[in-house]
C-alpha cells in the first residue's frame, strides 16, 4: 500500500488534492469523524422506527416524491435508484478523474450530513486505495439534482453490478470488489440517494481541468515571451510602472513574469533603439490579457476549493438537532459558472497564442523568412501549422459558449431549472487539448524564429526552453512530416516541462 493521507472531512485544499493524486497516496479517514457519521445514520434509523415520512428515505424520488414506500421495501428502493439511474453514455471518464470523484464523494459523505453507514464510506475508501475505478460514462448529467447518472455508475460496483477498471483493464465489478477486499453491499435507507445526490463529478472534471489549465497558463507566458524575442519585440510594455498604476494585482504579477523571462536577452539589446515604436497587441498587451486570465483562474480555484468540501446531498441530516431537511445544495450553478469562466480563460490563452503565430510567420511584420523557413516557395514551413492552430482556436471559441445559461427542465418539470455543470466542466478537457496544440505550435514557431537571430541568443531563462524544444525537435531547414513534432511538444507541455516553477528550481 502507498503512503497514507489522513482525511479530515471537509478540510481538503487544492494543494492536498494535487498531492493525493500526484503521489497516489492512500486515504485513511480521521477517527474523529466516526461519531458524526454514526450519529447521522442513527437519525435516519429513528425516522424509520418512528414511521415518519421523509423524502428520500421512505418516499419515491423526483416527481414521485409523494409516493410513500413501505418499510419492508426501503432496501429495495435504494438498490433500485442506483440501477435505474445508471443510464449514462459516451466515453468512459479517465482513471485520474474517477479517482478524484471517489475522493470528493468520500470527503462529502464522511462529514456526517448524509445518514450513511461508516461501512459504506469504508467501501469507497477501499476502491480508492486499491485503484479499482468504476466505469463511468461521461454523458448523462445535467448538474441538478446533482450528478445523478454518473454517480449511479460510480455506485454500481458496490452492489456487485457494472464494471470497473484496474491497471487499465476493464473487469467485472465482482472481480474489482475482490481486488479491494470487498463483498457486494446491501444498501440501507437513504444510502442509494446519498451516493447519487452530489456534484462530485462536475467538481472533479472542473478541478482536473483547472490543474492542467494552470500548466497551460505558465506555458503561454513562456511561449509568449519567446515570441516577443523571435519577433524582435519590445520589453518596454512590461515595465512595472505601467502596471502599478492600473492596479490589478494579477496583471502586475504577469508583467513581472515577462520581465524575468526576457531579462538578459542579447536579441532584445540588439534592437533596443530601433525605429519600431509599438508592437501589435498580442505581443504588447500580454500582461493585460494573461493577468485577466490569471484573475479568472484564481476565482475558479477559490470556488472549486469550497465546492470540494461542500455538502451537496439532499435531504440533509442534522443529527445534533434530529432534523432532516430538504433543500437544493445539489444544484451546480456555481460550478457551471466557474467552468464557464475557465472556458473563457482557455479560449483566450489559445486565441492570443494563435495571433502571435500569425505574426511570426508574416515576413512583413516579423522580418523573418516567410513562414519561418528558408527557400520559402519550395518549402511551406509553418504555413499549415498555423492553419491547425487557427482551427483549434476557432473550436475553442465555439466551446466557450456558456453552459450555465442552457437549462432544460427534467423529471416532469419537478426539476425545472438545471445547471449543466457537468457538460460545462467536461468540455474544458477538449479545450485543453486544443489549447495545448496551439501552444506547442507557438513554441515551435518561436524557437524556429530564434534560429534566424543567431549568433545572438535569447535570455538565459528562455534559452533553457529553446534547448528543451531542440532536444526533441530539430530546426526546420526544409519541409518534413510536421505532426509528430507538435505531439512531442504537447507531451512536454502536459508533463509540465515548460513551467515557471521548473525554471525557478533549475
UniProtKB/Swiss-Prot annotation:
Sites of 2,3-didehydroalanine (Ser) modification? 145
Pathway given for this chain reads: Amino-acid degradation; L-histidine degradation into L-glutamate; N-formimidoyl-L-glutamate from L-histidine: step 1/3
Which Pfam family, an example, fits this chain? Lyase_aromatic
Q: InterPro entries given for it?
A: Aromatic_Lyase, Fumarase/histidase_N, HutH, L-Aspartase-like, Phe/His_NH3-lyase_AS
What GO molecular functions are on record for this protein?
Answer: histidine ammonia-lyase activity
Q: Where in the cell is it found?
A: Cytoplasm
Query: What general EC class does the enzyme of this chain belong to?
Result: lyase
SUPFAM superfamilies linked: L-aspartase-like (SSF48557)
Where exactly is the 5-imidazolinone (Ala-Gly) cross-link placed along the chain?
144-146
Q: Which domain of life is it from?
A: Bacteria
Quote the PTM field. Contains an active site 4-methylidene-imidazol-5-one (MIO), which is formed autocatalytically by cyclization and dehydration of residues Ala-Ser-Gly.
Q: What is its EC number?
A: 4.3.1.3
Q: What are its GO cellular component terms?
A: cytoplasm
Q: Name one GO biological process term.
A: L-histidine catabolic process to glutamate and formate
What's this protein's family per the entry? Belongs to the PAL/histidase family.
What NCBIfam families does this protein map onto? hutH, PRK09367.1
Can you name the source organism? Answer: Legionella pneumophila subsp. pneumophila (strain Philadelphia 1 / ATCC 33152 / DSM 7513)
Q: State the reactions this protein catalyses.
A: L-histidine = trans-urocanate + NH4(+)
Q: Could you list this entry's UniProt keywords, alphabetically sorted.
A: Cytoplasm, Histidine metabolism, Lyase
Its protein name is Histidine ammonia-lyase
Amino acid at each position: 500500500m502507498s503512503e497514507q493521507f489522513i482525511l479530515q472531512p471537509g478540510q481538503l485544499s487544492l494543494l492536498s488534492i494535487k498531492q493525493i493524486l500526484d503521489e497516489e497516496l492512500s486515504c485513511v479517514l480521521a477517527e474523529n469523524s466516526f461519531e458524526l457519521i454514526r450519529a447521522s445514520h442513527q437519525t435516519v434509523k429513528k425516522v424509520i422506527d418512528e414511521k415518519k415520512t421523509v423524502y428520500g428515505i421512505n418516499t419515491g424520488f423526483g416527481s414521485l416524491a409523494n409516493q410513500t414506500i413501505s418499510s419492508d421495501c426501503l432496501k429495495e428502493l435504494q438498490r433500485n435508484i442506483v440501477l435505474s439511474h445508471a443510464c449514462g453514455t459516451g466515453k468512459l471518464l479517465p482513471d485520474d478523474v474517477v479517482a478524484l470523484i471517489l475522493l470528493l464523494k468520500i470527503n462529502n459523505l464522511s462529514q456526517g450530513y448524509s445518514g450513511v453507514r461508516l461501512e459504506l464510506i469504508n467501501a469507497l475508501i477501499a476502491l480508492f486505495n486499491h485503484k479499482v475505478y468504476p466505469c463511468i460514462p461521461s454523458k448523462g448529467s445535467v448538474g441538478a439534482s446533482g450528478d445523478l447518472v454518473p454517480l449511479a455508475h460510480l455506485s454500481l460496483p458496490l452492489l456487485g453490478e457494472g464494471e470497473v477498471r484496474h491497471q487499465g483493464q476493464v473487469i467485472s465489478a465482482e472481480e474489482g470488489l475482490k481486488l479491494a477486499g470487498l463483498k457486494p453491499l446491501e444498501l440501507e435507507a437513504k444510502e442509494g440517494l446519498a451516493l447519487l445526490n452530489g456534484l462530485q463529478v462536475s467538481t472533479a472534471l472542473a478541478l482536473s481541468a483547472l490543474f492542467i489549465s494552470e500548466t497551460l497558463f505558465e506555458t503561454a507566458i513562456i511561449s509568449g515571451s519567446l515570441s516577443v524575442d523571435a519577433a524582435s519585440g519590445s520589453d518596454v510594455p512590461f515595465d512595472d510602472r505601467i502596471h502599478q498604476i492600473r492596479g490589478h494585482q494579477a496583471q502586475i504579477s504577469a508583467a513581472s513574469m515577462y520581465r524575468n523571462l526576457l531579462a538578459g536577452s542579447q536579441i532584445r539589446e540588439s534592437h533596443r533603439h530601433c525605429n519600431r515604436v509599438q508592437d501589435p497587441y498580442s505581443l504588447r498587451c500580454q500582461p493585460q490579457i494573461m493577468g485577466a486570465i490569471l484573475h479568472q483562474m484564481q476565482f475558479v480555484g477559490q470556488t472549486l476549493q469550497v465546492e470540494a468540501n461542500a455538502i451537496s446531498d439532499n435531504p440533509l441530516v442534522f443529527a445534533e438537532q434530529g432534523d432532516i431537511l430538504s433543500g437544493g445544495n445539489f444544484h451546480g450553478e456555481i460550478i457551471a459558472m466557474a467552468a464557464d469562466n475557465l472556458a473563457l480563460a482557455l479560449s483566450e490563452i489559445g486565441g492570443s497564442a494563435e495571433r502571435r503565430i500569425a505574426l511570426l510567420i508574416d515576413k512583413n511584420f516579423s522580418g523573418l523568412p516567410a513562414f519561418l523557413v528558408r527557400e520559402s516557395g519550395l518549402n511551406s514551413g509553418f504555413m499549415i501549422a498555423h492553419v491547425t492552430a487557427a482551427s483549434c482556436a476557432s473550436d475553442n471559441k465555439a466551446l466557450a459558449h456558456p453552459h450555465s445559461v442552457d437549462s432544460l427542465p427534467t423529471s416532469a418539470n419537478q426539476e425545472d431549472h438545471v445547471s449543466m455543470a457537468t457538460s460545462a466542466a467536461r468540455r474544458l478537457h477538449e479545450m485543453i487539448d486544443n489549447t495545448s496544440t496551439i501552444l506547442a505550435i507557438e513554441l515551435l514557431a518561436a524557437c524556429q524564429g530564434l534560429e534566424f537571430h543567431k549568433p545572438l541568443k535569447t535570455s538565459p531563462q528562455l534559452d533553457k526552453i529553446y534547448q528543451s524544444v531542440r532536444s526533441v525537435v530539430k530546426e526546420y531547414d526544409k519541409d518534413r512530416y510536421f505532426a509528430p513534432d507538435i505531439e512531442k511538444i504537447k507531451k512536454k507541455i502536459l508533463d509540465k516541462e515548460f513551467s515557471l516553477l521548473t525554471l525557478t528550481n533549475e
